[in-house]
């Protein structure tokens, strides 16, 4: 039984003992961002004259320099926080039912703050009305997540999964890769299958990309997408500890890539997903709208859906045909949309 989250000081020796399982990959990822900031032509760090390389002027003021540093440090800080929380949760045996939502709230607050400090597009901030709509969709997304968990738990009760066969240090990356592949395939099917597109297309209606509208989803789309990932992990037989660690990273990445923030990760785009890639995914130009991975970009490379290159930005985001779905504010109509007879072709992959 997972014990309560302690109010006192944690067992530091136990924390480091379990957290070291994550130390090597997280350190590589953390340092990689800073290495890219010094080697990638797109951004070579902050020059002494107050300019961020890549042609972005930085005022000589402390605030301007702080924003420039934040553009480089924002993602490594998120990765570091994810590793710390995962390590603490594994070491102290925190209840995943508490850790996951609290961690998600922290990620949302952090990214929402970044959207104000270093926005990619200032006119992509949600309006008052959009905040209300996005809040309703977020609640519906939580309902979809709960339904997915219920269905997976029922299925696992019928089909007994295998027991964990790997040490935790190997199991965590294996769980991450397996869940990431399942998520990629489910997402791509959401675009290529005409029935699933009528669910997933609801997410692509907004003509802006930000943290808040990452929750704009059809309930059934969440059941399908999250159910596919959870069922894969359960049937393979990954331990709850490895699923928790991989899930924290996936959750952080999923909201990070959807954030309206001016952050670039350079060559790491070829390994990890980023806001740069996900804006292309939401492009109205279907020729550049690949990038179905929201955590790793490996699968986009492998299956030919990687379209990013440095400096590439979509001219507009949203639906290729805005009239093919109800507006975001028409929540009930969006939920009922899959029941209506299809009149237009789905977008291609």
Predicted regions and their residues:
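N-terminal membrane topogenic signal
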Residues: 60-77
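A membrane-cytosol interface segment of integral membrane proteins
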Residues: 315-349
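Alpha-helical transmembrane segments
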Residues: 95-105, 170-179
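Short, hydrophobic transmembrane alpha-helix segments
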Residues: 86-98
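Transit-peptide-like, low-complexity N-terminal presequences
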Residues: 37-62
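Transmembrane alpha-helical segments that serve as helix-helix packing and pore/cofactor-lining elements
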Residues: 113-134
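Hydrophobic core of alpha-helical transmembrane segments in multi-pass integral membrane proteins
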Residues: 75-88, 106-112
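Membrane-embedded catalytic scaffold of the fatty acid hydroxylase/desaturase
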Residues: 133-316
